A protein has these predicted regions:
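C-terminal beta-signal and adjacent terminal beta-strands/loops
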Residues: 618-619, 659, 664, 717-727, ...
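Short, acidic, small-residue-rich periplasmic hinge/interaction motif at the N-terminus
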Residues: 29-36, 41-46, 72-78, 88, ...
Length: 793
């Protein structure tokens, strides 16, 4: 028996060696007209599913059977190149491919949606269509067509991702829900793959594309809520001089100039710069609401050697916006809101949400040989924000109500660093795409007070009287006698193996993660405070999270996949809960996902489709119940970490061109959520902020001959009704909503003009981000005109 086994192994290895001897290797580099590398160019063997993508230095590696081939090299905005190559057995063929730009009349050609080639958040060079996970990328095409300058406009183009409200009005920060689960401010948001806090408007003019990786992504990012990760990939310096000026003006006294300037700093163009900056000031359809923000982001890229490159970025943001709590219903129902003017303002005009952030990024990339790269990324952020607002109580039948005030200052410092190696190699006929990395993230933040509610004045819903009480802004010092801590460390590895001439892919990966979070108390500051006698309560969790996926590509343009992934969330002790001491060391929340899907590029690769089925199970979630559910008080609740919540559904994303002159970005989602176990709420309840049905479509018409330069766009965005709380209070069920948008523009040489009309039917829609009788009114009809000028040489 042993002899037979040895003979079988010998025959197997002999066969592999024989196969390998009939193969050769294609290596080389893809360059532009300046001799600079083109990252993420597609190299495809004509008539085959075999292909690859160039890395950040333009390098590529492809192992194929000996023979004659046509190698097709494509890159967005460049003329494709077809090159005949001869591959000899047991030999290496080196190529240098130079691409030239197409004449696009200064229009940047962008591919986004599900047709995007790569997503930087995957930390690999794999094409999106080859990854066993649903990924959607929103790029410049959508940003420009929809004249977007906030996240709510962009994210409505992604199926299964729902905007659920603002913290303190449109000028603060946004809440999102994905696949039935809320995204967490300290977990689910990334900038160039590095964790950032969601405490301000994260849209910025230096964003090249917004990437959404759906489902649990703990293997790459550690403890994150299972709905998905939202990553912002920034613009990089260009080798040629480029200037873009953009001015938006519109209703509600909007004025928004923006500048994008880039070019080389030396003759060899190895040192390049880019600066994005903007200023925005506007009022609102809501009475007495206004906001002002400015932004600047300088970037330097330096190709130190042909193998070593360094990219340094700074992002400075500053915003001030009116507090806007929304509306309270006269009778506690959504229907009762019809009795109120959507413009009614219930806060104080002097109350502002202030946000300041300075972020710095350093990315060092070194190419090891022709197919490996080593990358180190460092990020540091310093954030200060000051919520200061009003929380109105429910009114009596005559409209009398009490207004409460809150306010605090918060300081936050965030540091992250990653080191990863990624490369491709072969073992016999099996191609490996290996990613190995280390990651560390550290956050420290403090508050000046707990943000409790204090009574401000007695008022009336139908006749609000402002300025009854003198304003006293929240003190900037002292901080509370503790520091909130988050420390994350992880080591991860994944390999996507390609078999059968790359028709069959197997992805396996695992992450070992260590997270510590909680509160560290300062002994010298405790005496005389409510926290006297408290001790450090830090929760440490060690978790192994696996990931496995299978991809089958019957054709180069189509793939089907199945995947399984695990995720986790570390819960900090809730010091504001009345039963805080009972849960000073809460357990982690665990999640699992099974996903099946298919991706395809049809109509001669013009139109991309992604269809996904998924099920996510979340166990031991954080939950809370108010002491008096019928009359809940903001700060009177108990917490628990128990239960089983499930979400499953179907998602469709479509992006591309139906014809050469008609493009589409569309999506639809069916999301079925359910409470399977929960000590606080009935089994069978739906999860909050998760509409059962959502849909979106944006059509854009651009003539290619007659009337060239004209663009016409139209969009429809629908959201089914949903509950704002897990107790499924029918009075707080947010009704169905929709908006219709239109756009018309014209581009003449370097000049452009575009008019966008949002919510043209003037629908009054609501959200309820706070579970209480407090509804956020969504924007009414608005006209925005964009004037643009571009110069490039």
């Amino acid at each position: 028996m042993k002899a037979n086994s040895l003979l079988l192994c010998a025959m197997l290895f002999g066969a592999i060696a024989a196969f390998a001897q009939n193969q050769g290797v294609l290596t080389g580099q893809v360059l532009d007209k300046n001799g600079l590398p083109l990252a993420y160019a597609t190299l495809q063997l004509e008539g085959s599913v075999q292909g690859t993508i160039s890395d950040e230095q333009g390098a590529f590696l492809l192992k194929v059977d000996a023979g004659n081939y046509n190698l097709v090299v494509t890159y967005i905005g460049y003329a494709p190149v077809k090159q005949a190559v001869v591959v000899a057995a047991n030999a290496e063929t080196k190529l240098t491919v130079k691409l030239t730009e197409e004449n696009t009349a200064l229009n940047v050609i962008e591919v986004s949606g599900v047709r995007a080639k790569t997503a930087s958040a995957t930390r690999t060079l794999l094409e999106v269509k080859d990854i066993p996970q649903a990924i959607v990328v929103i790029g410049q095409k959508t940003i420009k067509q929809q004249a977007a300058f906030d996240l709510t406009t962009l994210t409505r183009n992604i199926s299964g991702l729902n905007f659920t409200g603002n913290y303190s009005g449109a000028g603060s920060y946004q809440f999102f829900n994905a696949r039935g689960f809320d995204l967490v401010n300290s977990q689910n948001f990334r900038w160039n793959g590095m964790m950032i806090w969601n405490l301000g408007n994260n849209y910025a003019d230096n964003i090249e594309q917004v990437e959404f990786l759906k489902g649990p992504t703990s293997i790459l990012f550690g403890d994150v809520a299972p709905g998905g990760v939202l990553n912002f990939s920034t613009k990089k310096p260009l080798a040629d001089f480029y200037t873009a000026v953009d001015l938006k003006i519109g209703q509600w006294n909007l004025i928004r100039p923006a500048f994008d300037i880039s070019g080389p700093l030396n003759k060899s163009k190895t040192l390049r710069y880019r600066v994005n900056t903007s200023y925005q000031k506007e009022e609102s359809f809501r009475n007495k609401v206004e906001s002002e923000r400015y932004f600047v982001a300088p970037t330097i890229a330096w190709d130190i050697t042909p193998r070593l490159s360094w990219n340094v970025e700074a992002v400075i943001r500053n915003s001030t916006a009116s507090d806007d709590p929304g509306l309270v219903s006269p009778d506690g129902t959504v229907a009762g809101l019809d009795r109120l003017d959507p413009k009614l303002y219930l806060s104080e005009p002097s109350r502002k949400y202030k946000y300041k952030d300075q972020s710095y990024f350093s990315t060092l990339t070194y190419r090891l040989g022709d197919t490996w790269r080593l990358r180190s990324v460092f990020f540091y952020g310093n954030t200060k924000n000051r919520p200061w607002g009003i929380w109105p109580d429910a009114p009596d039948e005559d409209g009398n109500l009490q207004r409460n005030e809150y306010g605090y200052n918060q300081g936050l410092k965030n540091l992250s660093t990653t080191l990863d190696a990624y490369g491709s190699f072969y073992t016999g006929r099996i191609k490996h795409n290996l990613l190995v990395g280390l990651e560390y993230q550290r956050s420290r933040f403090r508050y000046t007070n707990e943000g409790y509610l204090d009574s401000l004045d007695q008022n009336n819903l139908y006749n609000i009287v402002y300025n009854q009480v003198p304003d006293i802004a929240p003190a900037e010092t002292p901080y509370l006698p503790f520091v909130s801590v988050i420390d994350r460390a992880g080591i991860y590895m994944q390999d996507q193996m390609m078999f059968l001439h790359e028709k069959l892919h197997l992805l396996v990966g695992i992450r070992a993660g260590l997270t510590t979070q909680g509160n560290q108390y300062k002994a010298d500051e405790l005496p005389g405070t409510d926290y006297e006698g408290y001790e450090d309560n830090l929760v440490t969790v060690n978790v192994l999270t696996p990931r496995i996926g299978l991809v089958y590509k019957p054709k180069e343009w189509a793939s089907v996949y199945a995947s399984y992934a695990q995720g986790y969330e570390v819960n900090s002790p809730d010091i504001f809960a009345l039963n805080y001491l009972d849960f000073s060391n809460p357990p982690a929340t665990r999640s699992t996902q099974v996903e099946l899907g298919t991706k395809a590029s049809i109509l001669q690769n013009r139109l991309g489709l992604s269809l996904t089925l998924f099920q996510i199970d979340k166990k031991d979630p954080y939950g809370f119940v108010y002491l008096d559910p019928a009359n809940p008080n903001y700060d009177e609740y108990n917490v628990y970490y128990d239960g089983h919540h499930r979400s499953r559904g179907i998602e469709l994303d479509v992006d591309g061109k139906i014809t050469p002159w008609l493009s589409v970005t569309a999506g639809a989602a069916y999301t079925d959520t359910e409470v399977l176990e929960d000590p606080g709420y009935p089994i069978g309840n739906r999860l909050p902020n998760a509409p059962r049905y959502t849909g979106n479509i944006w059509l854009n018409f651009e003539p290619v001959q007659h009337l060239k330069g004209l663009t016409l766009g139209a969009g429809y965005f629908y959201k089914n009704r949903f509950f704002s709380s897990i107790n499924n209070d029918p009075n707080l069920e947010v009704p169905n909503s929709f908006t219709i948008d239109l756009a018309a523009g014209y581009q003449f040489k370097r000049f452009g003009a575009q008019l966008n009309v949002t919510n043209i039917t003037n629908q009054v829609n609501y959200l309820n981000p706070w579970v209480f009788n407090l509804f956020e009114v969504q924007p009414l009809r608005r006209f925005v005109l964009t004037l643009s000028y571009k110069f490039q040489r």
